[in-house]
């Protein structure tokens, strides 16, 4: 009898000793290059830097959150913090409707989200950012049942030509981009005032004349990804099933010409044509609409 009790005690002690190892094994980890992010360390960082906007539970309603519409003339204050519970992310390299990769989340921390209150966290270490990614993924059950999508393939950018810009202009009309973004890309299309996000909150189309940076990056490569993956949670869809990959580059080239206040190879080439020069001149005369925002 005594031997049996001793055996039970030994088993109990073994279970207790193993418990921390079991908990540790259940911790979420991320892998960014050669760096492994850990949920526990990320939790401490989140409640130091992030919860004020994203909330104690990660649902995007922290004490610093400003309700949509509070400042109608400020596109920057009208961008809601990301709801990590919903796990719907705009900036991804993966197809629409899928979860982003760890690298996608990490890149958002490095880059920040342009035209929003989300800053770049480049001041943190690589390890810190990897840890934050690990903790952010604990808020939604989606990460337990779904895998991240497979990043889309971005073909090499073809040579910039007047023909590619002209074809992009035709696609802009054919795909009805103008209905939201307006014929000159000023964010004032006929549908602009009716747009809402996944929370049924008003959202503004991107105004190309307002700058050269996009929420998810600044390069042509970034713009291509936005067009082919869409911005989930917003009215901006993916056109991956509508347009050929190489043709998408033509649209990228044309969209750059709509950024009339930013010098770019695309704008310079377009200005060299009679049609392009007249269009750009007219856009500059018209100017940026008052209060036109860049939520998307």
Please state what every model-predicted region is:
Residues 1-7:
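N-terminal secretory signal peptides that target proteins for export/translocation
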Residues 11-20:
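Bacterial N-terminal signal peptides
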Residues 25-38, 52, 56-87, 143-161, ...:
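His/Cys-centered metal/cofactor-coordination and adjacent catalytic loops
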Residues 25-46, 143-173, 262-271, 281-295:
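Electrostatic cytochrome c docking/interface patches
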Residues 36-56, 160-186, 193-198, 251:
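Sequence/structural segment immediately N-terminal to covalent heme-attachment motifs in c-type
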Residues 59-60, 186-187, 245:
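Short, non-ligating residues that shape and space the ligands of small metal-coordination modules
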Residues 69-122, 129-132, 136, 194-240, ...:
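Extracytoplasmic electron-transfer domains, predominantly the class I c-type cytochrome c fold
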Residues 121-169, 183, 254:
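Extended surface/linker regions that mediate inter-domain or inter-protein docking
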């Amino acid at each position: 009898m005594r031997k049996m009790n001793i055996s039970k005690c030994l088993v109990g002690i073994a279970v207790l000793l193993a418990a921390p190892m079991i908990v540790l094994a259940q911790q979420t980890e991320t892998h960014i290059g050669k760096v492994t992010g850990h949920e526990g360390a990320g939790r401490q960082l989140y409640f130091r830097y992030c919860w004020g906007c994203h909330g104690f539970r990660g649902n995007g309603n922290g004490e610093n959150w400003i309700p949509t519409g509070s400042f109608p003339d400020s596109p920057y204050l009208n961008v809601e913090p990301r709801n990590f519970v919903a796990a719907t992310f705009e900036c991804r390299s993966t197809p629409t409707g899928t979860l982003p990769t760890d690298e996608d989340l990490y890149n958002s921390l490095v880059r920040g989200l342009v035209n929003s209150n989300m800053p770049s966290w480049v001041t943190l270490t690589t390890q810190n950012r990897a840890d934050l990614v690990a903790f952010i993924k604990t808020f939604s059950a989606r990460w337990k049942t779904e895998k991240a999508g497979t990043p889309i393939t971005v073909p090499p950018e073809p040579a910039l030509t007047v023909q590619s810009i002209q074809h992009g202009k035709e696609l802009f009309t054919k795909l009805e981009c103008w209905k939201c973004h307006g014929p000159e890309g000023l964010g004032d299309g006929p549908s602009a005032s009716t747009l809402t996000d996944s929370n049924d909150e008003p959202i503004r189309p991107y105004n190309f004349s307002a700058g050269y940076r996009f929420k998810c990056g600044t390069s042509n490569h970034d713009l291509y990804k936005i067009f082919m993956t869409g911005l989930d949670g917003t009215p901006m869809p993916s056109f991956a099933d509508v347009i050929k990959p190489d043709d998408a580059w033509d649209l990228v080239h044309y969209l750059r010409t709509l950024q009339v206040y930013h010098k770019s190879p695309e704008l310079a080439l377009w200005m060299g044509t009679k049609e392009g020069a007249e269009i750009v001149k007219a856009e500059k005369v018209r100017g940026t609409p008052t209060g036109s925002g860049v939520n998307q």
